[in-house]
Amino acid sequence: MIKVEEALTIIEANSAKMPAQQIAVSKALGYVLAEKVISPIHMPPFRQSAMDGYAFIHSIKHQYDIVSTSQAGDHSNLKLNANEAVRIFTGAFVPDDADTVVMQEHVIANKNSILIAAMPAKSANIRPKGEQIA
């Protein structure tokens, strides 16, 4: 039995390089790209919430004051403190300071604060900038 690296070397040495062709996308089934396709834009163009819930700075605390709301289409320069959270909706901008979004189903909420009943892992439920197209 040979190692994977050795097998790949043998395959590359015995494979013919095909010349690049320009063809219509509708006729491209079965072809491979000759070069990487890189988008000139990032989608989403910001860190985005993957859930309805609350964005906050992850810590061992479980209680946070609700200081703002972020809905899809909003973009804020809000600065969060360690004991603060933002009510956030799916697809909304995640404030720069926030590093985690907890699902609304995992909190006990009242008008001004939340108590996190099931603490998510740090970075949970945040889509990075450019996750869909980069």
Regions found by a protein language model. Name each.
Residues 1-65, 112, 126-131:
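Short, low-complexity N-terminal leaders and the immediately following helix N-cap/first helix
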Residues 55-134:
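Short, glycine/charged-enriched hinge/interface segments at domain edges or termini
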